[in-house]
Amino acid sequence: MKQWARLIIIGACLGSSAAEAQTTLDKSKYGYSYFTLGFENVVYEELFPGLDSDASVVSPVLNTGGLYHINTRFDFSIDALATFSPISATEEWHKSGTLIQTNQFEYLKAATNILLHYKLQDNWRVLAGTSLGYQTYKRYGLKNHNGYVNDVFREGNTWEEKSTDIFLDAGLAYDSGHLYGESDWRVSGRWVFGVPIWSVTENSRFEDIQFNDFGFRTNAEATLSYQIMPGLHLGWFVMLGYEKRFESDPQRVSYTTASGVEKQGQAWLPEAQTWTLNTGLQALWNF
């Protein structure tokens, strides 16, 4: 009887050691890295009283990052995105419905997002973090229409706006946190809402002037992937985003009119809206 008891104790110890080894192995499988190559379509609108503009720009986009395991309650993610080689689009300006100006428009952006994940239950997570964004809006090839003359931005001018933003973000995510599920198919997604805590925009037309603005943004994204081999998935990524910028406070500026006269006046950032569709092929791995 004592021998059987010893065997049971030894078996329990061995089983415990095996379980610990399995737990350690499982922990090594948590988290993953990813790389996305795709295209981004941006629809941008500016809204002045009685005056509005719109443009739609397409550009290639790279998105890379990963999800990193901390413990049973927390993970964190880092995402870095950049667009490049934008396809120039025509921006149209209308006053009370009448076309008054067109110009070529290019849009580029780069962003880095860091989020802490709190695991609620199963695959559901609460997100909180921050992000840094940099956007450029380039305009050139201005043409006036229907007798309108732009007194600030003249035909033949090229001008560029550069915006730097720091956002506080919060949201909700659905993610298993690993690539080793029972099914070969895997679904993940997240929704994030953010407000800027620091936002500065400069326009090359007005030297040494900075515009401070406020607004909000939100986006929803999802990935559907299939396991090619253990630890490697290929899939498709889709993200829909919306950003709102409110009109900024006016700044005192100096400029040269279309007729060559030096003048002073006020300038401000108009209310603006940006819709974004980002989609592409995504690879995820953990080896």
Question: Where do the model's predicted regions map?
Answer:
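Short glycine/proline- and aromatic-enriched beta-strand/turn motifs that initiate or cap beta-hairpins
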Residues: A21-E92, L269-F287
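Short loop/turn motifs that connect adjacent beta-strands in outer-membrane beta-barrel proteins
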Residues: Q22-G31, Y68-S77, L116-V126, G177-V187, ...
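Residues that define the transmembrane beta-barrel architecture of outer-membrane proteins
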Residues: G31, D54-L62, F84, Q104-T112, ...
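Residues on the lipid-exposed face of transmembrane beta-strands in outer-membrane beta-barrel proteins
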Residues: F39, L62-Y68, A82, T112-Y118, ...
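Outer-membrane beta-barrel translocator domains and adjoining extracellular loop/strand segments
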Residues: N41-S53, S88-T98, Y137-V149, I197-I209, ...
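Outer-membrane pore/translocation modules
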Residues: S85-A173
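Short helix-loop boundary/capping segments
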Residues: D151-F214
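Predominantly the C-terminal beta-signal and adjacent terminal strand-loop region
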Residues: F211-F287
